[in-house]
């Protein structure tokens, strides 16, 4: 089964570049047993935009919140605006408390430095 996330290689190029491997879970369905292996693809128009190949998850449903664990400290530095996608926020979690440390970009942020034609 294929699950398409709203992230991808523009914010985490490590699986495509280095074959980095991650574990994932559906945040609100942690107690449900896996249904079958799921491949998690990103949203870029690239055949290599796959974040995880065949990970055991419950049957994904629209709106599920996917968590990919321990993606690393360098993802933000490696992220780009490829395909004009805004970069995500960075959230630190400590003792069950979440804190945003970098706000997510908007499309206006991505386009702000473009110079219109004369």
Predicted regions and their residues:
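Charged (often Lys/Glu-rich) extended helix/loop segments that serve as interaction or gating elements
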Residues: 1-118
């Amino acid at each position: 089964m294929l699950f398409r996330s709203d992230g991808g290689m523009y914010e985490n190029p490590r699986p495509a570049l280095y074959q980095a491997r991650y574990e994932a879970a559906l945040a609100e369905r942690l107690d449900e047993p896996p249904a079958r292996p799921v491949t998690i693809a990103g949203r870029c128009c690239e055949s290599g935009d796959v974040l995880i190949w065949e990970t055991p998850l419950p049957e994904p449903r629209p709106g599920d919140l996917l968590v990919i664990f321990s993606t690393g400290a360098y993802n933000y530095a490696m992220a780009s605006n490829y395909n004009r996608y805004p970069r995500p926020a960075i959230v630190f979690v400590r003792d069950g408390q979440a804190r945003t440390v970098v706000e997510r970009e908007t499309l206006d942020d991505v386009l702000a430095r473009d110079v219109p034609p004369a």
